[in-house]
Amino acid sequence: MSCKININEIDPSVLSKLKSKAVLKIDNNGKPDNVILTRLINETAYIPFSMAKNFNLSIPLRNKFPAISTKFKGELRDNQMIVRREAIDILEKNHSVIISCFTGFGKTIGAINLACKLRLKTLIIVTRVVLMNQWKESILKFCESENKTIPIVEIISSNSKDEYVMCNFAIINAINIPKMEQGFLESFGTVIVDEVHLVMARKTFRSLLYVTPRYLIALSATSYRSDGLDALFPIFFGKEKIIRELNRKHVIYRVDTLFKPQVKYGINGKMDWNALLEDQASNENRNKLIVQVVKNNPERTFLILVKRIKQGEWLAKEIEKECFNRVDHLLNNLSIDDEQKEPKHVATLFGSNQKFDKNCKVLIGTSAKIGTGFDFDKLDTLLLAADVVEYYIQFIGRIMRKDDVNPIIFDLVDNNKTLQKHYSERLKVYKKHGGIVKNYKL
């Protein structure tokens, strides 16, 4: 999100100060790095949104943008209404806001409501295909328009043509923004950045310098980064942040596996982390323990988090066989064709998979697929089959989307100092957000 200025029309002293701020020096895991913050085309410069406002550079007026005819037909909960009022107050004052509410709070529906309130054509920026589809479904569910000639929402690809300008909401992947015509991008008065901690990565944050809205809304349950690019948040979005942290009773069972992974070292003397994860994922006894935990809790709906597809495939096959007895078709005199049509109890979400059977009792997925842009409100149990530390609160929130469930987490702890240190980090997260830790015995 940026402001567009003609450098020849800027006071020389202001321009000099802008140039001094054009490069951000960051510490990237102990390594100094320079990040270029502006975009210059001939005499036109694009300045990060909040930085421009700090220099009193003009924000585009409302009448520059097309209005939308969309009305919100949903209903916000009381806690969402409070956040809405706070966001409107901040937007009226600063034109930008970060909404950092826990997973399952309802940031999507809240942002749609805000866009309808602001009544300007809205661009939604995401980083994953699954997020594009979820936003479109939500907009169609919660919005209606009297003008049937203009689509309520369109998904924009790099091949999209000019007719896609004629919509109330547009959804685009951040990587495609630089490929679009500038005139198209300048038609959006409101921009929503979903999962902003992902968009602010080194490869994608500069896409924000191509859009020039009046209002800017950033969404994330984890609005921070650990690679030094955390410093970009106030530069683009300002310092105003609405925070709602998860605080809900949940039970964590620590499962001591007794498994001791083989530790290998590279030529640089550092531990080979990938080799350790491979050993962890392929250990048969450890994987059988996971199957047994699922088998012992048939009333639960599991989310099993893995980092290696081969582990997920093995677990899916064994859990289907051991926990749901796939040979029961023989007892019921079902034919082979009938057995093939029978729905499976275990679904997977990894690799090229973008969808899964929502009637499943067990969902196995990689952290890349389930960390963001994932919505399955039947889940009540998380089983950590792989090591996870960063943005862990995102995963906990996946099993707390419904108020009428008692969330349970099974955290597998292996015999390794590094893995145990990571468990200690997760333990802090559990206790901070209402967790009660117990030991689990098979």
Curated annotation (Swiss-Prot):
Domain Helicase ATP-binding: residue ranges: 88-241
**What positions carry the motif DEAH box?**
194-197
Q: Which Gene3D superfamilies match?
A: P-loop containing nucleotide triphosphate hydrolases
Q: Which residues form the signal peptide?
A: none
**Alphabetical list of InterPro entries matching this protein:** ATP-dep_DNA_Helicase, Helicase/UvrB_N, Helicase_ATP-bd, P-loop_NTPase
**GO MF annotation terms:** ATP binding; DNA binding; helicase activity; hydrolase activity
Similarity field: Belongs to the DEAD box helicase family. DEAH subfamily.
Q: How is this protein named in the record? A: Putative helicase 161L
Origin species: Invertebrate iridescent virus 6 (IIV-6)
Which classification does the entry list for the species?
Viruses, Varidnaviria, Bamfordvirae, Nucleocytoviricota, Megaviricetes
